[in-house]
């Protein structure tokens, strides 16, 4: 890192670019590895079934709507 700073101070842009690329290469490789791991975690393991948490919530909501419709229709019958 000190070499990069010295190259910048001395206006040696070619050396600064090379030193910067070397410093960033290691960090870039680490970030790529981390991203590959994160992506791999998103894929299902063979034979594993996805969780249906969202579908269960939707089913409960639709049941509530059906119950509400039934109550509304009962109230309409009482009015007659």
Curated annotation (Swiss-Prot):
Q: Where is the composition biased (Acidic residues)?
A: 46-64
**Which key words tag this protein in UniProt?**
Viral release from host cell
What InterPro entries would the database entry show? GP67
Site (described: Cleavage): 46-47
Indicate the segments annotated as coiled coil, or none if absent: none
Instruction: Cite the residue spans of the region called Disordered.
Output: 43-80
- Function description: The production of one phage particle requires 250 copies of PIP. During head maturation, PIP is cleaved to form the stable head constituent, internal peptide II.
Entry protein name: Prehead core component PIP
């Amino acid at each position: 890192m000190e070499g990069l700073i010295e190259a910048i101070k001395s206006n040696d842009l070619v050396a600064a670019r090379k030193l910067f690329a070397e410093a960033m290469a290691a960090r870039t490789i680490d970030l790529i590895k981390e991203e590959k791991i994160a992506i791999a975690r998103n894929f299902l393991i063979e034979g594993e079934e996805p969780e249906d948490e969202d579908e269960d919530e939707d089913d409960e909501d639709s049941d509530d709507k059906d119950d509400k419709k039934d109550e509304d229709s009962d109230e309409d019958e009482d009015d007659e």
